[in-house]
UniProtKB/Swiss-Prot annotation:
GO MF assignments: guanyl-nucleotide exchange factor activity
Pfam families membership: Bud3_N (PF12015), PH_BUD3_C (PF25351)
Polar residues bias: start-end ranges: 749-761, 786-800
Stored SUPFAM superfamilies: DBL homology domain (DH-domain)
Chief localisation class: other
Name the record gives this protein: Bud site selection protein 3 homolog
Disulphide bond pairs: none
GO biological process terms held by the UniProt record: axial cellular bud site selection; cytogamy
Transmembrane listed as a keyword: no
Subcellular locations according to the entry: Cell tip; Cell septum
Region Disordered: start-end pairs: 732-889, 1085-1106, 1146-1168
Biased composition (Basic and acidic residues): 1146-1160
């Protein structure tokens, strides 16, 4: 466990890894032994490796002779850590000797084997039994002397160099020496109440120094030490005087350039910057602090000046000895430019902007320093890198102009010249264009070149927030010859492997560290230089999951403690200028940067131990993601509920008393509570003590909530000890499989880490990984031996299609028309992609029971759009593993049934890499994907893939699907033992056999682009929010001759539809006289397509037809079979449809039957599809396609009242080639926990299953069908778009027949301005008494409240005797009802075209003509009455926007009936009202 230590150096967290996770008695001097002593002892030790299935797992045992006692000691490394056994007694007097008696006879004479047996028994006895139960709750058998002896018999001796390597790795991995955690984050929580503000401020004052910024450039900047410097040669070969005049001139030019630039930098520091710094420190410049000054003129300029001085000294020393020595001096000094210049560039990125503000603010205070103008300052700050280009040009001339005398000089000069060029080119050089899928976007959006192979998908987005904290060169402790890179971001830590890194660093010349080059690329947004070695990602971890500890000489260990994949990796820093504690401190700062809520920052530094305290407000802290397990609560009552609210393991509750004493209560989740008191001066010391007590137990003890993760990490370390390079290389190949070969992700891809339904442009899901169990190789071996006699030989099964070179477009198109060879088909279908078949180190088997598919963990598991489309199986569907016939892609259902009845059938133990399925092909029943119809949530298959991917995807279920050839009947039995799936599929097939008219063809045909399909998919499309927003306020159609852009819906206000029920909801209507059946009758079709599991969740098909409506030539049949439920198979005939119609109780004319039969028997060749529109049902969630339609007249309900998305009407005689864009459900509409759909599906949990209820229930009558469907449409949020014949209520049935007999659009001459009169009916007299006053008193207010949704045309109500234009009287309700019916019979709706109206006047008369127009006298009195009477009110708010058109009724002449009613009404008015109106 970890122990707290305080010594003369200071306080620190000491991780004593010499102890195990479970406490046991151990000698203290064993734990304090130095690493060098351990290396000497373990180098001579006898090392054994073993595997214990009961408790210890894989373990390593070291038996060595202790120098102090000359007796045998034993050291064990297993899943609970390192355990020391001192002075092991192997004599027969030992109480552990029975373990020796259980050894083999040949082992009983070996002392080391006897010590091993005794040690295995003794270590179990020393451990606390309650702690042993944490390893395994219940032991299947006792761990006793027999178990220990047998385990010692099975241990293998590690001999030779391997044994010495294990001993060294025990030290290098930090397993036998203390590890330290010197940097921690402490969360402080306070409540923002006025009564505790002062007390909180007093307490946080003692938490340390409050920091304004997390990174201080002054304290954290350290110049790079010059390890190599130029020295003049001992023996003089040549001198500058011996050179040609041209060479002398070039060398002197180089020296002069460097002299002038260096002197200008030195003068800038001495005359301007240093005096200005002194003034800022002395506060002589008002408002100018040191921090502000260093932001403008960063300290990096000092380092740049220092490097230039070193370079100038080297040139001066080398110049007398000739051009070759000048090149040597440049090659030795140039590498030191890199780090200084790149940091200076990053620090002065915004200097040109900041200097203007600086001079305008403080220019007057710098009057004595004004000889440096803005332009001169800008030139000096940005000058260093500009001078590098000039230096390179001069060196190029120097190297090219010299004729080297000997080959030795030529080689030496060439080496120096190449070294100089590589360094200067490392600052950034143009590269040829590269693909974007392996590039990374910088915070400003600039694209970098490929950083590394297998770049994690988690780091391909959020670059606007991500910051680069540090990049470091490291050396792996498992392979000292290997060079790696550690990149610390603000949210992730990435470990990169440098491919052939030893070659890059080999040689005499000093090269820039790859970490510095990478830092320059990330910070300054420049491409990587071409000479940098290739990098690949080893692993990456979220910053909050990583615990960094230091040990030895500049060594670090990164432990990832998440529940999913705990891991550990150890490195040694390659540069001696960087300390391991500094890297660990940066990781703590990165965690603080990842916080997403506001906080106050405090820092406490006690020697090498740093504590960063982040103070959060209590309510805001509840939403924080990055939290510390130990939380300090200020003036908050202690309670376990407070710990649970903030996800804290232990809380320290501090409250300030009146006498400035602090009461501290330490409370754990287990209820343990300790109380202590301290003064304010000792408050911080007491907090540090509590941290030193908590974190050792939290990071390495049996009581830690991370105990399981810690045990898994120890198991990995044991594997590393036994096979260090194998684990190291395996991790690389595993990562390459995960990121590079499995999926090359585009760098700008945004993924939801966690849901397969969230897609990104350019990708499709080609395969869903299965949830599979893992067993160890030893378990697999043991299980396979027991099954060897019962299992036949099993051939390899192809799981992925072979990936060929991408074909051209012409090749793809030509491949659709010629018949492929059988061998070619077999090769394409059975071939495997070996690049995708990598084993991750474990053997996978399938479970006995059907398991659910695992959702995609990350976008890495998505595949690019390929030439073979694999149907994505959602996570909600059950896994289907079926026996596949060698010749067909259909399911061998009888083999499934036999396997179900076979008691001896077992699941085959087939290794399956993660993310791959056993079979590529999904189960198909008569050419239809059964898995597709079992889905609960289907994805939209809209093409949003890579535009440069494969051109023509083949439909699933086509001839070239993957099949498994050569499988015997026994193999099929073993591969298909999922009983539930077999029963479901057999039931589905039996239903299809009972319904022969609905059987689909056994195999799908490839659809050639350009030919329409003859079968009609069931189309469900959803409402587009943008469509409703743009067209929700418009009305429908005027006349056919009008422009298509003017076709909007007239009439039928929402108030009329809803309030008076003019058009009640009815069943889905007919197309060309063909009526859709009631919903319940469709169950016979649906049963053949849908599994019974998902009846409640799958959208119901509402219409069936045998006519093709698709002429979108780019869409293939296979795609529609996946996108939409095909309710009508090819074999369905017109007679079948007619027979069903008669059953439903509907009929159509004989002419329509003949016409329908002709259309059904006509085979489409190249002509467009028939001019028929299918029954369309709007649902809340539906995919969208562009449809090219030639359709008949359709009556569509009001857009506003019914929520319709489409409004479109055409003539019977004239085809309209119009593309209708249906509503597109964007990616945000997919059901994802992080993406809320724009329109949620309307669920009706109370609605019974239609299929179950209607299969046995007979169809009673038309009215019952209508009632059933009306309820369904109301509950599902569905409206009728295709109804042609409307069955109105009995009171309006006569009016409905007239509308049907006289269609409103048949007469195209109604293209002038007409008013249409509806058939509104009043419900009560209260409405008539309130409308008149409301009409005029509120017209102004109503006009302000309601926005115009033009073009809008309105319909006036009937002018009957009891109407007051919009008001009704209750004189004779019965008579009014009869008049409404009569007028409905006589009048019909009249239509108007907006394109035929002048914007001001229809007759194009001047405005003065209408100014002279007066209101008829017979209407003047009534108009005056309506203006004065304020009692008239509207019950329906939708009438408000009709008010502005009421005045038009005054210009229409009324008939005699209306005049009589007006006179009668005026005679009955009392005298007071008459006087008031006059």
């Amino acid at each position: 466990m970890l122990t707290a230590k305080q010594d003369e150096v200071g306080r620190e967290l000491r991780v004593a890894t010499g102890t195990s996770l479970i406490e046991y008695p151990v000698k203290d001097w064993l734990l304090r032994r130095q690493p060098t002593e351990w290396e000497a002892l373990l180098g001579e030790a006898a090392i054994f490796s073993g595997q214990d299935e009961l408790l210890w797992g894989p373990f390593v045992a070291c038996v060595y002779r202790e120098p102090r006692t000359t007796r045998l000691n034993c050291l064990f490394m297993d899943r609970i850590g390192v355990m020391h056994l001192h002075s092991v007694d192997v004599s027969d007097t030992s109480r552990f000797y029975p373990a020796v008696e259980n050894l083999r006879p040949e082992y009983r004479t070996q002392v080391v084997r006897r010590c091993l047996a005794v040690g295995l028994l003794k270590k179990y006895v020393l451990l606390d039994p309650s702690a042993v139960r944490l390893i395994r709750a219940e032991l299947p058998y006792d761990y006793d002397q027999t178990t220990a002896g047998d385990l010692a018999n099975t241990c293998e001796l590690v001999e030779g160099q391997a044994a010495r390597d294990v001993g060294q790795l025990l030290v290098r991995l930090g397993l036998v020496q203390p590890r330290h955690v010197r940097s921690l984050m402490l969360d402080v929580v306070y409540e923002n109440h006025a009564d505790v503000v002062d007390a909180n401020n007093k307490l946080v004052y003692y938490l340390g120094e409050q920091l304004e910024q997390l990174f201080d450039p002054l304290t954290e900047y350290s110049p790079e030490p010059t390890e190599l410097s130029y020295r003049v040669p001992d023996q003089v070969r040549t001198s500058l005087s011996d050179e040609m005049p041209l060479m002398v001139s070039i060398c002197e030019e180089l020296l002069q350039l460097q002299t002038n630039f260096t002197l200008s930098l030195v003068g800038f520091l001495q005359k301007f910057l240093i005096p200005l710094r002194i003034k800022a420190l002395n506060e002589q410049v008002p408002g100018l602090s040191t921090v502000k000054l260093n932001n403008i003129f960063p300290p990096t300029i000092d380092e740049v000046t220092r490097i230039n001085c070193i370079f100038l000294d080297a040139l001066k020393a080398a110049l007398p000895y000739g051009s070759l020595e000048v090149l040597k001096a440049c090659s030795i000094t140039a590498p030191y430019f890199y780090k200084a210049y790149t940091r200076h560039e990053a620090a002065t990125k915004f200097f040109s902007r900041d200097i203007k503000s600086f001079l305008s603010t403080f220019g007057k205070s710098l009057s004595d320093l004004n000889f440096y103008s803005e332009i001169k300052l800008d030139t000096l700050i940005h000058g260093p890198q500009e001078k590098l280009t000039k230096l390179k040009l001069i060196i190029d001339r120097l190297f090219d102009s010299k004729d080297w005398e000997t080959n030795e000089e030529q080689k030496e000069a060439d080496r120096c010249y190449r070294s100089i060029c590589d360094v200067i080119d490392s600052f950034g050089k143009d590269e040829p264009p590269n693909t974007y899928d392996t590039r990374v976007f910088t915070p400003s959006g600039k694209i970098l070149t490929e950083l590394a192979k297998g770049w994690p998908a988690e780091l391909q987005y959020k670059w606007l927030k991500r910051r680069v904290v540090g990049v470091f060169d490291v050396i792996s402790v498992t392979d000292p010859e290997s060079r790696d890179i550690v990149v610390i971001f603000s949210d992730y830590i990435v470990f990169l492997h440098v491919i052939n890194g030893n070659l890059y660093y080999s040689g005499d010349s000093k090269k820039p560290l790859i970490s510095d080059v990478l830092m320059n690329s990330l910070i300054n947004e420049v491409p990587l230089p071409p000479k940098i070695p290739k990098l690949e990602v080893l692993s990456h971890s979220y910053i909050d999951d990583v615990v960094v500890s230091t040990y030895g000489k500049n060594s670090l260990r990164f432990d990832t403690l998440n529940a999913e994949r705990p891991s550990s990796v150890a490195y040694t820093l390659a540069s001696s200028s960087v300390e391991a504690s500094y890297v660990a401190d940066l990781c703590t700062k990165a965690r603080i940067l990842e916080k997403d809520t506001a906080f106050h920052l405090f820092k406490t530094a006690i020697d090498s131990f740093h504590v960063y305290s982040t103070a959060h407000e209590s309510e805001a802290y509840k939403t924080e993601r990055i939290k510390s397990p130990f939380v300090l609560f200020l003036n908050i009552p202690d309670s376990i509920g407070a710990l649970q609210d903030h996800n804290a393991t232990v809380g320290l509750f501090a409250s300030l008393n009146k006498n400035d004493k602090v009461t501290l209560v330490r409370l754990g989740l287990d209820g343990s509570r300790e109380e202590s008191f301290a003064s304010l001066d000792n408050f911080l010391s007491l907090i540090i003590e509590e941290l030193l007590i908590f974190y050792p137990s939290y990071l390495s003890s049996a009581t830690s909530p991370l105990f399981q993760q810690l045990m898994q990490i120890n198991e990995q370390l044991v594997q590393t000890l036994l096979d260090p390079k194998g684990v190291h290389s395996a991790s690389k190949s595993k990562c390459a499989l995960r990121t590079s070969k499995k999926k090359k992700m585009p760098a700008n891809l945004v993924s939801t880490n966690d849901n397969s339904r969230t897609l990104s442009p350019g990708t499709i899901i080609s395969r869903t990984p299965r949830t599979i169990s893992t067993i160890t190789p030893k378990q697999e071996k043991r299980k396979s031996v027991g099954q060897a006699s019962n299992s036949p030989a099993r051939g390899s099964i192809s799981t992925t299609p072979r990936k060929h070179k991408r074909e051209s477009i012409l090749g793809k198109i030509s491949g659709l028309f010629h018949k492929k060879d059988k061998k070619e088909n077999k090769r394409n279908s059975v071939g495997s992609d070996t690049r995708n078949r990598h084993d991750n180190g474990s053997v996978h088997i399938l479970r006995n029971s059907s398991s659910s598919f695992r959702e995609l963990e990350s976008p890495r598991q998505m595949k690019r759009f390929s030439s073979v489309v694999h149907t994505a199986v959602p996570s909600s569907s059950k896994r289907r593993t079926s026996g596949i016939s060698p010749s067909k892609g259909t399911v061998n259902l009888r083999a499934l049934q036999d396997a179900e009845n076979d008691d001896n059938a077992d699941i085959s133990k087939i290794p399956i890499p993660e993310g791959e399925s056993l079979f590529d092909d999904t189960i198909r029943v008569d050419g239809v994907d059964a898995d597709f119809y079992a889905q609960k949530d289907r994805l939209s298959k809209i093409y949003n893939h890579d535009l440069y991917g494969e051109v023509v995807p083949s439909a699933p279920g086509s001839k070239n699907v993957n099949v498994v050839s050569g499988a015997t009947r026994e193999q099929e039995k073993q591969q298909n033992t999922q009983k539930a799936i077999a029963r479901e599929l057999l039931a589905s097939v039996d239903q299809q056999k009972r319904q022969p008219t609905h059987s689909a063809p056994a195999e799908s045909q490839i659809v050639i682009p350009g030919l329409p399909q003859s079968n009609v998919p069931q189309i469900n499309f959803g409402r587009s929010p943008s469509f409703i927003e743009l067209f929700g306020g418009m009305r429908l159609v005027l006349d056919e001759n009008d422009e298509s852009v003017n076709w909007r819906r007239l009439c039928s206000e929402r108030s009329l539809n809803e309030k008076y029920q003019i058009r009640p909801a009815t069943y889905a209507g007919c197309i060309s006289g063909e009526l859709a059946p009631p919903v319940g009758i469709i169950s016979d079709q649906r049963d053949s397509n849908l599994s019974g599991d998902n009846d409640a969740d799958t959208p119901l098909p509402m219409h069936s037809s045998n006519k093709s409506i698709l002429s979108d030539e780019t869409l293939e049949k296979g795609e529609f079979e996946r996108d939409f439920a095909i309710s009508t198979p090819k074999s369905q005939t017109v007679s079948d449809v007619n027979a069903r119609r008669e059953t439903w109780g509907y009929s159509h004319s004989h002419d329509e039957e003949i016409d329908s039969e002709k259309r059904a028997n006509t085979k489409p060749v190249s002509a467009p599809a028939p001019n028929v529109i299918p029954g369309l049902i709007i649902t809340a969630n539906s995919p969208t396609k562009p449809w090219h339609k030639e359709n008949t007249r359709i009556k569509v309900s009001d857009v506003r009242s019914e929520g319709t998305d489409v409004s479109y009407i055409s003539s019977l005689k004239k085809s309209s080639n119009r593309l209708v864009e249906l509503s597109v459900n964007s990616q945000e509409d997919f059901e994802d926990e992080r993406h809320t759909p724009v329109i949620e599906p309307i669920q009706n949990p109370e609605a019974p299953s239609l299929i179950e209820n209607t299969e046995t229930a007979p169809v009673a009558s038309n009215s019952s069908n209508e009632e059933t469907l009306s309820k369904l449409l109301g509950s599902q949020g569905v409206i009728d778009l295709t109804e042609e014949t409307i069955d109105y209520s009995s009171i309006n049935r006569k009016h409905a027949s007239i509308q049907t007999a006289y269609p409103v659009l048949d007469d195209v001459e109604f293209s002038t301005f007409h008013m249409s009169f509806g058939d509104m009916k009043a419900e009560d007299s209260h409405l008539a008494n309130q409308r008149e006053s409301y009409l005029f008193s509120n017209s102004t207010i109503a006009g302000k409240k309601d926005e115009s949704h033009g073009p809008v045309f309105y319909k006036l109500p009937d002018f009957v005797a009891d109407d007051s234009y919009l008001g009704y009287s209750a004189v004779d309700q019965h008579a009014k009802h009869e008049r409404n019916t009569e007028i409905g019979e006589e009048d019909e709706a009249m239509w108007v075209s907006p394109s035929k109206l002048d914007i001001f006047d229809l007759s194009k008369q001047p405005e003065s003509v209408y100014k002279r127009t007066s209101i008829p006298a017979k209407h003047a009195e009534l108009l005056s009455k309506m203006r004065k009477d304020g009692s008239v009110k509207f019950e329906e708010s939708m009438f408000i926007r009709d008010n502005s058109y009421v005045y038009l009724g005054q210009f229409l002449s009324a008939d005699e009936v209306i005049e009589q009613q007006d006179k009668k009404l005026a005679a009955n008015t009392d005298e007071m009202d008459s006087a008031r109106r006059l």
